[in-house]
Amino acid sequence: MRNYRNYITVLLLSALLCSCGEYQRVQKSDDYNYKFEFAKRAYEEKKYVQAATILKDCVTVFKGSEKAEESLYLLGMSNYENKDYLSSGSYFKTYYTRYPKGKFAEDARFYCGYGYYLDSPDPQLDQSGTIQAIEELQAFLDYFPRSDKVSIAQNAI
């Protein structure tokens, strides 16, 4: 029983070290398609910091290509999931400005405003962030009045 537990521990540590090694290889790689696939997998595995770091490189390189839209959206979502709402809002705003009819436009508008809402300060502090959240959420409601996220946006406002 004890050997079995030691075996499991060694196996888990090996897997952890291999995944760290892969991340380092990806960061040094010049193959941006490989980086993009790794970033998507990291995002799916909830490794948002790794995904965001890799996607920052990909967004610049993929600008004007068919992967540009998805990489920019995933960069915004990685920052959002990592609770970096100001950065995510900036990426989402860039997304819906570049791709107003893109396949992630609705989510980008929503998460931009909702992220600013989540980042809003206490009432006794400067409310410029709150005003920005209200403006973004209202724009979301104006653009997507039939969205399934309408009630969430209305409650936040």
PLM features: residue spans?
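Acidic, polar-rich low-complexity tracts and alpha-helical solenoid repeat scaffolds
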Residues: 2-4, 16-157
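Bacterial N-terminal signal peptides
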Residues: 9-16
